[in-house]
From Swiss-Prot:
The keyword rRNA-binding does not apply. One of its GO terms (biological process) is defense response to bacterium. Has antibacterial and antiviral activity. It comes from the Eukaryota. It comes from Mytilus edulis (Blue mussel). Keywords: Antibiotic, Antimicrobial, Antiviral defense, Antiviral protein, Disulfide bond, Immunity, Innate immunity, Secreted. Disulfide bonds join 2-27, 6-29, 10-31, 15-34. This is Mytilin-B.
Amino acid sequence: SCASRCKGHCRARRCGYYVSVLYRGRCYCKCLRC
């Protein structure tokens, strides 16, 4: 899912927090506290 892919991506970058939004079939991911 979008959230799980985003979570994995931000975890790999060692970020402490993430926000994921599924909009019109596209996954948008923002990593925070990196």
